[in-house]
Amino acid sequence: MSIWNDIWELFFPRYCVVCSRRLLRGEAHLCLSCLNKMPRTGMHLQVDNAMEKNLWGKFTLGKATAFLHYAKDNDVQKILYALKYYGDSDLGIFLGRLMATELQPSGFFQGIDYIVPVPLHERKKRKRGYNQSEMLASGLAGVTGIPVFKHLIVRDQYTETQTRKGRFERWMNVQDV
């Protein structure tokens, strides 16, 4: 790190998005402790895993996984809120790279031709400044070399926020979008 980076860090220190501890050199977005405590699912190692079963019959699917366990008020929620609502687009790239780095040794990405991020309505994209799904896809692509096709799917209907909806309500909210 250069002297300029040290000076920058002095005036603009970086903090962990989970525990708010000041980040050390070499840490990005998450401190090492929070990074190691992130609840990984291990689904990518399971044939016909819970994520795949949840999506069966809804659309044609090769494979699916969830990288982290999400629960209300857990650390993953804090990370996703920082990504979606606090303007931390680089966090999405970081998470995509982390996911790809951890899943790639298992062969999970073999046979995958493209990464297609979930589209965001233009109104939400303007408000947020970016599509968090595109940021994750960019991070995945950076490690795997798999190309990202951002414009393969288009969202033409605006939907209200789903943060206070149950699973069924969420599913119904995005029908025909």
What is each model feature region?
Residues M1-V177:
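Glycine-rich phosphate/pyrophosphate-handling loop used in enzymes and phosphotransfer proteins
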